[in-house]
C-alpha cells in the first residue's frame, strides 16, 4: 500500500506528498516515518484515515480515526509502533468503534498550575506559544474579576489558569473535555478557586441573559462563531468580555450584534500563531458603553 504524508492545495481535494514541513514541532517531524508505518499497518484502500498528533511533556499523543477495526491481530502491531516511537498514548478508533487507547504514560498538558490529560484528538490551541499569548490577553482583560464564565471551554485552556484567582463556570458542548478539566482542577496544587462545569450545546441552547451574571465572560467559539450566544449576551447586563476568535469574518458579525446593544471593542490583540498562512487569532476586549 502506498502512503503519503501530505497536504491538500487550496480549493482542492488532491493529495500532495511532502518530505518536510516547516511548521511542525521537531518531535512530530521526527515521527513522520513511524506515522507512515502506522498508516500502512492500519489503513485500508477503501477508507480515509485522520491522525491528530500532539506534543506533550510525556511524549507524543497520537489519535487515529478511520482505520481498520481494532482486532487481536492489529493491537500488538500498534503497541509495537507506540513502543518504538516512545509515544505517550496511541488511540485507535476504527469504523463504528469507540477509541481504544494504548497509554504508556498519561499525555499531560499544563494549563496554569493545573495538569490535564486531554481526550484523544480533543481541541487544543495550535502551539504552546500561541496559547500563552492568548492566555496573557485573556488574563489582562479579566483582571480583577471574582467570577468568570468560560464559554466553549474545551478542557480548560482558560478556565484552569483563571481559577487561580476567580471562581469559574465552564460550559462546553462535549462531556469528555469537561471531565478532563474537572480532573485537572481536583489535582491542582495549591488548590484552585471553585470550578463548576456544564455540558451544553451553545449553538442550540445559548445561555440566556439571566444566566450571564458573572463579572467577566470569556468566549472562544469555533470558526463558525457564536451568533446565537452573541444575541443573548447583547440582551444581558454583561459588562466585560474577552472574545477569542480564529475567524475575523464571523467575529465581525458577532461583534456587530454586541455593538448594536451598547457593547464596544476597547482593545484588540492580534496573535499570529498560524505561521505562513492567512489565518489569524484575535482576542477582543469588549465592554458596555
Enumerate the language-model features and the residues they cover.
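A short glycine-rich, hydrophobically flanked beta-strand micro-motif that places a catalytic Asp/Glu
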Residues: 46-55, 90-91
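Short acidic-glycine loop/turn motifs at beta-strand connectors
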Residues: 1-3, 10-12, 56-58, 95-97, ...
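Short, surface-exposed charged micro-motifs
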Residues: 6, 50-52, 108, 115
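A short interface-forming secondary-structure element
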Residues: 21, 63-72
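Extended interfacial segments that mediate partner engagement and assembly in macromolecular machines
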Residues: 1-48
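Feature of Fe-S/electron-transfer and energy-metabolism proteins
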Residues: 26-28, 51-55, 149-150, 155
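Short small-residue beta-strand/loop micro-motif enriched in glycine and branched aliphatics
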Residues: 13-18, 60-63, 118
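Rossmann-like S-adenosyl-L-methionine
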Residues: 69-289
Amino acid at each position: 500500500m502506498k502512503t503519503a504524508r501530505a497536504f491538500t492545495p487550496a480549493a482542492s481535494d488532491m493529495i500532495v506528498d511532502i518530505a518536510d514541513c516547516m511548521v511542525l514541532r521537531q518531535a512530530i517531524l521526527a515521527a513522520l516515518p513511524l506515522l507512515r508505518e502506522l498508516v500502512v499497518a492500519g489503513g485500508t484502500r477503501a477508507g480515509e484515515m485522520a491522525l491528530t498528533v500532539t506534543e506533550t511533556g510525556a511524549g507524543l499523543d497520537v489519535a487515529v480515526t478511520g482505520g481498520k477495526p481494532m482486532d487481536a491481530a492489529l493491537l500488538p502491531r500498534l503497541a509495537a509502533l507506540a513502543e518504538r516511537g516512545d509515544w505517550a498514548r496511541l488511540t485507535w478508533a476504527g469504523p463504528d468503534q469507540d477509541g481504544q487507547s494504548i497509554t504508556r504514560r498519561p499525555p499531560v498538558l499544563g494549563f496554569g498550575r493545573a495538569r490535564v490529560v486531554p481526550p484523544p484528538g480533543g481541541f487544543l490551541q495550535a502551539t504552546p506559544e500561541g496559547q500563552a499569548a492568548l492566555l496573557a490577553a485573556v488574563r489582562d482583560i479579566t483582571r480583577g474579576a471574582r467570577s468568570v464564565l468560560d464559554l466553549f471551554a474545551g478542557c480548560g485552556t482558560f478556565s484552569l489558569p483563571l481559577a487561580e484567582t476567580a471562581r469559574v463556570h465552564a460550559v462546553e458542548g462535549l462531556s469528555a473535555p469537561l471531565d478532563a478539566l474537572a480532573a485537572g482542577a481536583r489535582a491542582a496544587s495549591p488548590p484552585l478557586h471553585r470550578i463548576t462545569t456544564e455540558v451544553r450545546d451553545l449553538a442550540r441552547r445559548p445561555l440566556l441573559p439571566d444566566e450571564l451574571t458573572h463579572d467577566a465572560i470569556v468566549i472562544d467559539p469555533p470558526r463558525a462563531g457564536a451568533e446565537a450566544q452573541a444575541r443573548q449576551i447583547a440582551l444581558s447586563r454583561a459588562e466585560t468580555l474577552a472574545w477569542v476568535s480564529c475567524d475575523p469574518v464571523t467575529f465581525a458579525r458577532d461583534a456587530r450584534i454586541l455593538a448594536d446593544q451598547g457593547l464596544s471593542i476597547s482593545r484588540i490583540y492580534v496573535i499570529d500563531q498560524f505561521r505562513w498562512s492567512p489565518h489569524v487569532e484575535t482576542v477582543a476586549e469588549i465592554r458596555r458603553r
